[in-house]
Amino acid sequence: MDGTLFPGDDDLAIPATEFFSTKAAKKPEAKREAIVKADGDNNEETLKQRLTNLEKKITNVTTKFEQIEKCCKRNDDVLFRLENHAETLRAAMISLAKKIDVQTGRRPYE
């Protein structure tokens, strides 16, 4: 069963290599040097752009996380109020049923 991802009880095992590779592809050295030379001129500028893009993405994720947190808290408060309301309705229905039983004579007054 080694090298498989989540095989079912009666399914055939699926090799893990079909989903991902654990080895990085090697790039030819000649092309690598040409790419490094081309990137070397604007290396600092591209690095700054990458950092600003990364900062924007992180800021976006944190703001979305804060919004999700606020929504979850609000939903928790609403759920608490609904549960409390349901319990109040249940108690009111029980007391009403007792009152009706007493008034119709099915149950003696307590």
Curated annotation (Swiss-Prot):
Q: One Pfam family of this protein, by short name? A: Vac_Fusion
Q: Where in the cell is it found?
A: Virion
Q: Which GO annotations describe the biological process of this protein?
A: fusion of virus membrane with host plasma membrane
Keyword annotations of the record: Coiled coil, Disulfide bond, Phosphoprotein, Virion
Sorted alphabetically, the Gene Ontology cellular component annotations on this record are: viral envelope
Its assembly, as annotated, is: Homohexamers, covalently linked. Interacts with OPG144 and OPG153.
Q: Which family does it belong to?
A: Belongs to the orthopoxvirus OPG154 protein family.
| Known function | Structural protein involved in the envelopment of mature virion (MV) to form the wrapped virion (WV). The wrapping consists of the addition of Golgi membranes to the mature virion. Participates in mature virion (MV) movement within the infected cell. May play an indirect role in MV-cell fusion.
**Name of the molecule in the record:** Protein OPG154
Protein species of origin:
Variola virus (isolate Human/India/Ind3/1967) (VARV)
Gene responsible for this protein:
OPG154
